[in-house]
Amino acid sequence: MCGQHYTSIISSITTEASFERVRTHEFIKFSKHKRFDQRHRSMMGQYHSGGEIVSPGTSPFDVLPEDCISNIISFTSPRDACVAASVSKTFESAVSSDCVWDKFLPPEYESLVSRSRVFASKKELYFALCHNPVLIEDGKKSFWLEKASGKRCIMLSSKELWITWGSSPEYWQWISIPESRFNKIAELLDVCWFEIRGKTSARVLSPGTRYSAYIVFKTKDRCPGLGHLPVEVGLGLVGQESSKRFIYFIGPRDRRGRRETRDVTKPDQREDGWMEAELGEFFNEERCDEIEFSVIEIKSPSWKSGLIIQGIEFRPTKSQ
């Protein structure tokens, strides 16, 4: 019922407020702007001298029923919903509605959370899935939501990977460490032929989204025979040619300008204490089926050791 009727109300309000080309959802952007005249500032709430909102005031959109505001906000994003909560007390209340956060949750969310845990609201549940990854598929995958967008993220445990000689205890061992989200992860003991491959269904990821894939790891004793070598990695759709690049697990040993080091991706430190190196990017279209990846170093005759692999992570690519 609120659709076209309240769209015209929003249009008349924004015209009166002298905003040009305001679309229905643009009220969520008001609090981001610092260049408002005094009239707009008084409409949008309380500001300090820097021009940013410190507490919600009133908004011309407060004439709308709260459930209609909630319905409109549910068609935006979690980030925009949080911004909208700063517009006014009415918006703050509307944003807290379960109908808003239900739209941001994955359809199967009930199967992802423990039945023994009770959440006060869908908003609380949403942020729980952002901050506390849950194990799925017999504990071999980890699932969570990107906080700003609600896009799906997953990590495949090293148990889900195909590792050459991975079942041979003289070459690899499976360990449990408290800082891992998985029960067992792979530790490289000693190999010449270092090869890891894997694939996963793209359907567990959000469609219409560009993703980046990362290998998540730790090193021991400077990762002898491997840490300073460029390692070839590949990523792509099954049945198509994969994109190739090179990564380091530590970095080049000689920093005096070897040509090949300029095009090799160096690892980054993560907030959770692990390291990660990017394997590549892909766009997850509606028709995407499976994504495959590889991490290989078989050119050097050196014996390789000192690498602990937690898994392969897929998350939305950050905008540059």
Curated annotation (Swiss-Prot):
Give the transmembrane ranges. Answer: none
For this entry, the protein name equals F-box protein At2g02240
Source domain of life is Eukaryota
Q: Which GO terms describe its biological process?
A: embryo development ending in seed dormancy
Q: PANTHER family given for it?
A: F-BOX DOMAIN-CONTAINING PROTEIN (PTHR32278), F-BOX PROTEIN PP2-B2-RELATED (PTHR32278:SF57)
SUPFAM superfamilies according to UniProt: F-box domain
Organism, by scientific name, is Arabidopsis thaliana
Annotated ranges, domain F-box: 58-104
